[in-house]
């Protein structure tokens, strides 16, 4: 019979072994993830006002 608790403990043990193997601590992992997220979203927060000037308003034709 499948025991969910045993399965969860096994996954936790595997994660601990992986973290010990790569010498990744939880606080280092948090810093790593936050820096990756900052790098991914940096292009979205960059302001390109010159591109906004080139846009033209959309014209609506009413019947």
Curated annotation (Swiss-Prot):
Entry keywords, A to Z: Host endoplasmic reticulum, Host Golgi apparatus, Host membrane, Membrane, Virulence
InterPro entries on file: NS6_bCoV (IPR022736)
Statement: the UniProt record of this protein carries the keyword Membrane: yes
Location(s), subcellular: Host endoplasmic reticulum membrane; Host Golgi apparatus membrane
GO cellular component: host cell endoplasmic reticulum membrane; host cell Golgi membrane; membrane
Purpose: Could be a determinant of virus virulence. Seems to stimulate cellular DNA synthesis in vitro.
Additional facts recorded: Bat coronavirus HKU3 is highly similar to SARS-CoV (SARS-like).
Family that this chain belongs to: Belongs to the coronaviruses accessory protein 6 family.
Protein name as annotated: ORF6 protein
Source organism: Bat coronavirus HKU3
